[in-house]
Amino acid sequence: DVAPSRGLGDVYKRQEINWDSHMLGLVGPRGVGKTTMFLQHIKQNMNPKDTLYVSADNMYFADNSLIDLTDKFSKRGGKHLFIDEIHKYPNWSRELKQIFDSYPDMQVLFTGSSILDIYKGTADLSRRAPIYEMQGLSFREYLSMFHQIHVPVYTLEEILEHKVEIPGIAHPLPLFAEYIQHGYYPFSKDITFEIELNQVINQTMENDIPQYANMNVSTGRKLKQLLMI
């Protein structure tokens, strides 16, 4: 889920995330830059001596729990725990709830790509962790990141009243067509974009949806075939 770092932090300032929350979640489709945003925030704002970044699919968790990790990290002076891809850890919401209640000095921040599973599990975290939903690039953000054309934010009323101006663009429609075709993902300029996009689709159809709906893998593949019709 690592996207190009160029300008991504500035692009997603619109999220207005309260990074000081005791616990928070950052969810969104695969490939929109959640991991990059985490790593940028750690690099720019955190002290490496009391900060730990882990991925929930790490082999460490085959024999250890999140609570075990938190306990060991806390005893070594840890204060900030970043957990990537939390949905890959079984019963993650229950353990996060326990960590929230048992370790008041430990800040926990997590990401998740399986939005359905994340919202299914947030019942255990109600009133404990704000969940921020991170989408792909808007047309305005796409122009800023890939064409260095900076357009201010307009309200719907301003757009409907034709008070919108896009400086530096004489003919915006070709750029908009380009955005519609491949502008949603920050990695759209990669040479391997089509391969990466297919991987995102396959992971969603063959893993995320079947896992959420308790379907087997073959059913997930059939669902993908139906969508291709």
Positions of the model-derived regions?
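Structural recognition of the conserved hydrophobic beta-strand(s) that form the central parallel beta-sheet
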Residues: 107-113
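Short regulatory helix/loop adjacent to the ATP-binding pocket of P-loop NTPases
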Residues: 116-130, 146-147
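Walker A (P-loop) phosphate-binding loop of P-loop NTPases
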Residues: 30-31
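Interdomain hinge/linker elements that couple catalytic modules in large macromolecular machines
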Residues: 144-229
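Single conserved hydrophobic/aromatic residue that forms the stacking wall/gate
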Residues: 1-12
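Short glycine-rich substrate-engagement loop in P-loop NTPases that contacts/grips substrate
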Residues: 49-77
